[in-house]
């Protein structure tokens, strides 16, 4: 689509120059012919020169209107900011006061306005993808010998005319057919590679399944399973996923093949192919070229899908390697278990210094008792040998002698194995010998119980041994009576069998040691391989990250491809619709073209740009320089051409950057090929190493099977006396009971370990508590030391003040006395005055004594009882979310004296007439406005708005958008006169109230005092 847009802009420039040239004098030159001769006045019918072959006259400029948005100033608004006042001089720790200052800032709003713009569209009568469909078919036949002229070349994405770097599709039909053939060859090669990868993958999956099944059978069953055995479930799932991915790749390749076939059909016998072949100059087909480019992009996408499938295959291969590593670990663990079963673990005593004396004494006592049991077994063996010898002297050794010896040896091995786990636990106990001294003194009772249990076991074992001795003696006597033969031959035969068994046992021990060394070597090699595999895993993780980034880029390219395909389908539909229309307007367009041709013939102004160094500018102003990769003509509309040149340059830069991005993506994909080769080599080395390890493990298992088979044959040769099977079975049952006892001892040891762990946890807790208390004590001691220093300083200050006060008290603050003045002379006695008026009456005399009390009066009537003080008060909180408008039900009642508040409705009903104190605290969500009204008998009394006061007349100064509320808290507090039956509630108008277990939104009220006058009113 981008090259087509560039061609359209180029045609617009030429059409604009041709339209403006029609108003100049008639003498001139044609801009659209290849020759330089003057045009004849006879019109197109009388002209013998070749007809213009350009398609650039079918674009016209239209003036359109558009609505754009802009931001306008909408007055000012007032904001309040806090201003912290600084402390005065010499007052560093004063309480800072806050002053609030108001500021003015501009307010803006969004407005819309209509502007005009120029837009290039197809002229009337023209249509199609590049406005090439119109009345051109009725203008006359094309000349047979056109004059040579420079052929326009389609520019590439970078702005040059050398062709496209991405696809190379820039010209004629033969070049396009070659490109199609090249793309078909690429598709065929990709199909072959896909089939080869599929075959390799199937072979590897088959070999991997066989190897895994063989390894599992060898470890668990000790034999090879048949070839038709079932594989593991995980392998089937992996194979199904790989087959699905391969099927997806196959479907995409088939889709690309279908598109190539469709494209070939379009080029060979598509619509419009024959008509274009008869023209003088074949014009490149825009839709076919776009289809070829789209096909190339889809091929690149399919390549990326192939790479993604290869990455999935590598990931699956890594998972198979991890499974093989797990199987190797399982094999090593099974071999270790076999080694433990074949040879009992050797007891290893700890050093004498690791245990306390009490534990050593008890352990020695246990060892002594076990030695007694061992001695009893030895005596039993000796007695059995003597009795067998006597029987041989009478009638020879019985035939079941070797079987009895083997059964007794296995019995002794099982008895030793019951002691092995306890010794191994003692050896591997994580507490260590050094911690035994901490918990043994705290558990003497448990050790005594353990000793008692061991004594009972020893007694029971002794009884069973005596019974076993009697049974063996009877069996020996019976066998001696039944069996007969030469004593010398039987002795030699028994000695040979015993010596052969001893040699086999020694050989088995040596071979088991060799097996153990081989297992250690295999384990070391496995660790080395594990390190190598971990490194490969890190490399694969980095590759996976890079492929994820490439997948994101591919997804973006696919989105753009889909958009381009949608636009292409729309344009094809439009082209089909325009192709079906008739040419009814061809006559008018032909007349208009005739007038335009006459005007061009009468034009005498030079429109071409100056070619020589001395040529000056034309009438239309200075000529414009050529665009990047295009040739343009100068004209009178210089500003319009300059604007078009700028827009085309921006488009070319955009496509250049897209081309660079595609080159970088191609480089990255090429680098992935080298990484794939490295991974393939690493995979081959890992597979060879795994095969070598598997071969060694198979050989080792085969040798072990042969050795065990030899041991089983020896045991089968040794056991031929069926009379002792039942008794030895009962003896084995006793050994199983001893195994149960050993399990109980192990449980006791585990319980002691848990108690020790609990004791250590308590010790650690006590240590932490002690450290905390020590820190507190140190802090207290430091505070006491500082307190002593402060008290000393205070005492010194008091002593100093006392000294100063004493000094001040000793000072005399009275001033010096003045001189006494002389006494004055006595005055003369004056004459007596006239008598005055009579004075007021004198005071009353004193009251007389109280008379005797009178008789007792009668008792008055009983007064009215005191009125009870009513108790009316309530307080409730909100614990449920509330965002709908209406009465708020404060459901959590904190206080409700009298029960006059209903928590379900949130309404308080006044029981008495009087003065009531009502208060409420409404807390909303942050930056959300809350509005509420306090209603008395469904009449609003008070209103709160957490956003603050908002004046009327907002329609004169509208606000562009609502500003967030700075606060979300409202408070009611007022005293109301209420009559009996009046209701009080809070109605939510706007916002959402906060709810919590801790009260945030509260409604309270209380009766202050009654008012009877209010009740009468």
Swiss-Prot record:
It is found in: Secreted, Extracellular space, Extracellular matrix. GO terms for cellular component: collagen trimer; collagen-containing extracellular matrix; EMILIN complex; extracellular matrix; extracellular region; extracellular space; integrin alpha4-beta1 complex. Disulfide bonds join 60-123, 87-94, 122-131. The gene is Emilin1. Disruption phenotype: Dermal collagen fibrils are thin and curly, and collagen cross-links and EFEMP2 fiber formation are significantly reduced in knockout mice compared to control. Knockout animals have an altered bone microarchitecture with decreased trabecular bone. Glycans are attached at residues 156, 416, 456, 562, 659, 767, 795. Involved in elastic and collagen fibers formation. It is required for EFEMP2 deposition into the extracellular matrix, and collagen network assembly and cross-linking via protein-lysine 6-oxidase/LOX activity. May be responsible for anchoring smooth muscle cells to elastic fibers, and may be involved the processes that regulate vessel assembly. Has cell adhesive capacity. May have a function in placenta formation and initial organogenesis and a later role in interstitial connective tissue. Residues 1-21 form the signal peptide. It comes from the Eukaryota. GO terms for molecular function: extracellular matrix constituent conferring elasticity; identical protein binding; integrin binding involved in cell-matrix adhesion; molecular adaptor activity. Residues 56-133 form the EMI domain. One of its GO terms (biological process) is negative regulation of transforming growth factor beta receptor signaling pathway. The lineage of its organism: Eukaryota, Metazoa, Chordata, Craniata, Vertebrata. Keywords: Cell adhesion, Coiled coil, Collagen, Disulfide bond, Extracellular matrix, Glycoprotein, Secreted, Signal. This is EMILIN-1. Homotrimer associated through a moderately stable interaction of the C-terminal globular C1q domains, allowing the nucleation of the triple helix and then a further quaternary assembly to higher-order polymers via intermolecular disulfide bonds. Interacts with EMILIN2. Interacts with EFEMP2; this interaction promotes the incorporation of EFEMP2 into the extracellular matrix. Gene3D superfamilies: 2.60.120.40. Its main location: secreted.
